[in-house]
């Protein structure tokens, strides 16, 4: 569903017909970019700068593009709800220039040849306006460079936007951290009808594999392997028939244990106390904890010890949209750079709650924003129950500089934040060591897991009463007996 279209820079019919006006068609997720209109008291006053969102990000881009390049751009900005909806729109002939799919979808689009590669110029850190190349986290850059499709790196066709991990949001009054730190919680009958899982096959299958293989994944023999991260990815992306059958059986049990399979309702269910725990993406977990805190409810976030799913949304250009138009491609790449400007990355993080792939490079803005949210001094100013006695060092060098334990990026924070919003928004390097990315599945794998999911969501053999099985067996026996009798009768004739 299209929820909005921006047409910027005094876009009139005359300008639309003007050959000097570039039309840029962008498709993103709903409520996934700063739409402006901040209240007067919403200024983010950082050590390095003050940040506000008076206008929408799209309108600000239109103004910036004209000021920077002397060209008018008309942005047609559309929103969709799911990756599958986006793919269906593309196959039906809808045309966009720039889209923001999740990692598995841009892998699929790469495989099928839909995407336009980014220019070499886009990654030139010597160009002032290349905010993405200059500011992307070294950790994220390495991930996009090292992951490949058909021998080509993600970074050739995709630039990161937001990222995160998956885990369990939980109420510490009902659930211990240890109980929440394993995927086996989704089938723990102690929390029967008190926990939610995601209503999509990829996320919930990931959790099921983590639970089924829990003992193996947590064993020291497995963890100490030299190629541990590769082996972990193999295990979590196992779509063999035996594993999928095992996942089916496990999820049929889970179906009887959970409160619901949900996409969005789990947020309010956690905040209002309808559930004690729920599978969540870290970005949504931050939002849930913020809302709960506003209602004086404490919720925490745990990242399972078996493995966590590292996910991305990334900008990608479509061949069918760009269609060889160099000016349009320049505008699309400029939009990615504009939203990657540290101040704009902060605006988007503040507005949507997810974590930008931008660490800022030489700019201190992103780390200043981190301190503004989670630094001990800021926390003590907001809550007089927090003191130096609660202090703990939280190392994020791997994300900001690519150097573990970089003293410039050891955040002094409160211990509570290591189990709360900070841990969801910026997981530690140790957590990321046990992360895996769900790969794009080929047609055979997709058919197998989709059929499994249909069986889980539409039919549960564990719910069938014994008398039904007896009746079915009796009917089968009766059919066989009648068939034999019919054969004998015909032989006699």
Regions inferred by a protein language model and the residue ranges of each:
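N-terminal export signals
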Residues: 1-8
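Low-complexity, acidic Ser/Thr/Pro-rich repeat tracts that form intrinsically disordered stalk/linker regions
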Residues: 9-17
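Early extracytoplasmic/lumenal segment of secretory-pathway proteins
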Residues: 17-108, 112
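Extracytoplasmic ligand-binding site segments that recognize negatively charged/polar headgroups
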Residues: 27-43, 48-54, 104-269
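Short helices/loops that flank or line small-molecule/ion binding pockets
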Residues: 59, 84-96, 111-112, 185, ...
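Conserved C-terminal helix/tail region of periplasmic/extracytoplasmic solute-binding proteins
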Residues: 392-493
């Amino acid at each position: 569903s299209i929820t909005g279209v921006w047409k910027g820079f005094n876009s009139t019919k005359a300008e639309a017909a003007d050959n000097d006006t570039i039309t840029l068609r962008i498709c993103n997720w709903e409520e996934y970019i700063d739409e402006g209109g901040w209240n007067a008291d919403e200024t983010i006053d950082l050590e390095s700068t003050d940040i506000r969102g008076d206008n929408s990000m799209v309108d600000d881009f239109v103004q910036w593009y004209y000021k920077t390049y002397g060209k008018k751009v008309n942005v047609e900005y559309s929103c969709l709800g799911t990756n599958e909806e986006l793919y269906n729109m593309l196959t039906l002939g809808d045309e966009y220039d720039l889209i923001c799919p999740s990692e598995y979808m841009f892998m699929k689009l790469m495989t099928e040849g839909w995407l336009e590669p980014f220019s070499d110029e886009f990654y030139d850190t010597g160009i002032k306006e290349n905010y993405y190349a200059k500011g992307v986290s070294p950790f994220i850059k390495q991930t996009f460079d090292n992951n490949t499709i058909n021998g080509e790196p993600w970074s050739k066709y995709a630039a990161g936007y937001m990222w995160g991990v998956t885990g369990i949001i939980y109420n510490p009054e009902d659930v211990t951290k240890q109980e929440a730190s394993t995927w086996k919680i989704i089938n723990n009958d102690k929390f029967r009808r008190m926990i939610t899982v995601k209503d999509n096959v990829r996320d919930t299958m990931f959790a099921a594999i983590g639970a089924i293989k829990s003992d193996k994944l947590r064993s020291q023999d497995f963890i100490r392997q030299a190629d541990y991260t590769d082996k972990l990815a193999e295990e979590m992306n196992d779509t063999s028939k035996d594993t999928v059958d095992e996942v089916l059986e496990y999820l049929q049990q889970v179906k009887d244990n959970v409160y619901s399979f949900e996409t969005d309702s789990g947020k309010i269910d956690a905040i209002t106390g309808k559930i004690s725990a729920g599978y969540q993406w870290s970005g949504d977990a931050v939002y849930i904890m913020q809302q709960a805190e506003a209602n004086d409810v404490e919720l925490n976030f745990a990242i399972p010890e078996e493995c966590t799913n590292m996910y991305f949304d990334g900008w990608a250009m479509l061949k069918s949209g760009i269609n060889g138009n160099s000016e349009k491609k320049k505008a699309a790449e400029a939009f990615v750079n504009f939203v990657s400007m540290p101040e704009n990355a902060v605006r988007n993080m503040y507005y949507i709650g997810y974590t930008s792939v931008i660490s800022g490079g030489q700019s201190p803005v992103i780390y200043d924003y981190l301190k503004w949210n989670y630094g001990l001094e800021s926390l003590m100013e907001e809550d007089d129950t927090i003191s130096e006695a609660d202090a703990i060092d939280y190392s994020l060098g791997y994300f900001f500089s690519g150097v573990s334990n970089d003293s410039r990026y050891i955040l002094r924070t409160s211990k509570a934040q290591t189990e709360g919003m900070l841990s969801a928004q910026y997981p530690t390097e140790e957590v990321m060591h046990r992360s895996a990315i769900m790969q794009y599945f080929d047609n055979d794998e997709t058919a197998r897991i989709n059929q499994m999911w249909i069986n889980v969501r539409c039919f549960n053999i564990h719910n069938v009463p014994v008398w039904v099985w007896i009746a079915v067996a009796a009917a089968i026996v009766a059919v066989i007996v009648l068939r034999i009798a019919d054969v004998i009768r015909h032989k006699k004739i």
